[in-house]
C-alpha cells in the first residue's frame, strides 16, 4: 500500500471516523483492528480476524468522496483484485511476498499474511550507525544487497514490476534460530504491491530498478558505494536481465536530462 500522506482536507482520524471498517471486519476478532498506517489511497491495519493467534495485515481502501461513486467502486475493485492476483502469482512462482488470506473487492479490502520483522531501511540504517568509512568493505551489507538484487530479478523474471521499489517496501523476516540477532539476517520479503503490474517490458523493469536506485541514494547516501551489488546480483537472475541493465543506462540518462531542465 502506498503510504503517501493524505491531503490536508482528508485528516486521517476524520477519514477513519467517516469511513470506518466494514462491520464484518470488526467481529469476531478477539481484539479490535489496530491502525498501523494511513495513506492517501487506503489504510493498513493489524488484525486477528481469522484466528486469535494469527495476526493478519488488513488493507482497506475506503470510499473516495471526491469521486463519482460508480467510478470509485470500479477503481477500488480493479486495484484490490489486481494486487491480490499479482501476490498470488508471485507466491505460485516462488517470489517471497505476503500470502493472500481473504479478499472482498466490493467492500474494498484485502487480508494478507502479517510479516514479522522490520523494513530493510531500518536494518541498513542500524548497520551503518554513525560510520563514514569501511562501508564498501562490509561483507554482510553487500550480501544483503545481493539478496535484494536476486529478489527483484526473480520478481521481474515472472513478469511482475513493483512500481514503488524502496527499502521501506522490503521486510526482513527473522530466522527461526533465536540465537541469530543480526539485523541483516532473515528472509527478504517484498511488500506493498499496490502499484505493481504485470509486464515483461525491459523498459518497465529498468524503471523499477531506477526508482529503487534513486530512493536508495536518498535514504542511504552513505551506502551508495554498495548498491552496485544489487545490480550485479540482478544481472545473474534471468536471461533478459543484462538487457534490462543496459536499458537502465538509458533511463538514467533521461533522468539526468530532466533534472537539468528542471
UniProtKB/Swiss-Prot annotation:
It comes from Gibberella zeae (strain ATCC MYA-4620 / CBS 123657 / FGSC 9075 / NRRL 31084 / PH-1) (Wheat head blight fungus). GO terms for molecular function: ATP binding; hydrolase activity; protein serine kinase activity; protein serine/threonine kinase activity. It holds the Pfam family Pkinase. This is EKC/KEOPS complex subunit BUD32. InterPro entries: Bud32, Kinase-like_dom_sf, Prot_kinase_dom, Tyr_kinase_AS. It catalyses: L-seryl-[protein] + ATP = O-phospho-L-seryl-[protein] + ADP + H(+); L-threonyl-[protein] + ATP = O-phospho-L-threonyl-[protein] + ADP + H(+). Its main location: cytoplasm. Its EC number is 3.6.-.-, 2.7.11.1. The gene is BUD32.
Amino acid at each position: 500500500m502506498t503510504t503517501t500522506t493524505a491531503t490536508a482536507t482528508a485528516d486521517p482520524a476524520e477519514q477513519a471516523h467517516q469511513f470506518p471498517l466494514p462491520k464484518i471486519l470488526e467481529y469476531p476478532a478477539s481484539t479490535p483492528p489496530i491502525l498501523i498506517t494511513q495513506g492517501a489511497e487506503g489504510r493498513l491495519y493489524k488484525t486477528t480476524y481469522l484466528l486469535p493467534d494469527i495476526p493478519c495485515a488488513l488493507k482497506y481502501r475506503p470510499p473516495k468522496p471526491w469521486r463519482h461513486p460508480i467510478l470509485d467502486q470500479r477503481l477500488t475493485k480493479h486495484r484490490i483484485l489486481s494486487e491480490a492476483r499479482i501476490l498470488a502469482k508471485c507466491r505460485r512462482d516462488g517470489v517471497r511476498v505476503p500470502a493472500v488470506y481473504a479478499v472482498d473487492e466490493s467492500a474494498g479490502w484485502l487480508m494478507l499474511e502479517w510479516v514479522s520483522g522490520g523494513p530493510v531501511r531500518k536494518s541498513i540504517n542500524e548497520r551503518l550507525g554513525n560510520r563514514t568509512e569501511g562501508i564498501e568493505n562490509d561483507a554482510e551489507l553487500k550480501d544483503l544487497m545481493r539478496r535484494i538484487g536476486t529478489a527483484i530479478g526473480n520478481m521481474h523474471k515472472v513478469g511482475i514490476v513493483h512500481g514503488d521499489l524502496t527499502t521501506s517496501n522490503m521486510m526482513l523476516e527473522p530466522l527461526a534460530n533465536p540465537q541469530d540477532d543480526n539485523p541483516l539476517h532473515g528472509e527478504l520479503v517484498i511488500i506493498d504491491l499496490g502499484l505493481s503490474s504485470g509486464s515483461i517490458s525491459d523498459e518497465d523493469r529498468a524503471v523499477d530498478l531506477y526508482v529503487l536506485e534513486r530512493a536508495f541514494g536518498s535514504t542511504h547516501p552513505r551506502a551508495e558505494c554498495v548498491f552496485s551489488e544489487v545490480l550485479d546480483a540482478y544481472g545473474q537472475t534471468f536471461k533478459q536481465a543484462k538487457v534490462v541493465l543496459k536499458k537502465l543506462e538509458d533511463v538514467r540518462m533521461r533522468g539526468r536530462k530532466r533534472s537539468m531542465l528542471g
